[in-house]
């Protein structure tokens, strides 16, 4: 069974621990082992929530995978992504990609119409969550898989390569994709997730 958890700007508190706790509760509602899949900032969430005993593996899709004491923001500073100048906070501290720059920053390998839809429906994260540090990364003791987007302008590809290497991922797949690889390269992304689930089910 596949379950999807979306964290929107209107449904979370300022504390990223709420995201982790909500994910853990969803894990506890499943009847069996769980493979967590995280995209972008969702990778940081599954890195912490993945310590739940029912989680048997993690799959990162162009995602943050912080180490102990590390934050997504700290990783970003190692290799600043091309789209960084196009992010701007609003008066409540949420980080938005400028609408006019969204397509070229987030999903340049999709059509302009698809980019427009994503721009007007984007879920802005609280800027402060990028400074939240991981206490213990689940990938340190659980099998993991990683998909790198080689044309990513949101999380620098060099940061993705670094994270996938240090976690000693079972498999790393590099796709010629933007940050929106789930939409632009769905077959490749789905194949990696399917492979992970199949291996864990043996």
Annotate each predicted stretch with a short phrase.
Residues 94-139:
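Conserved alpha/beta-hydrolase catalytic His-Asp/Glu region
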Residues 51-99, 126-129, 155:
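Flexible "cap/lid" loop of the alpha/beta hydrolase fold
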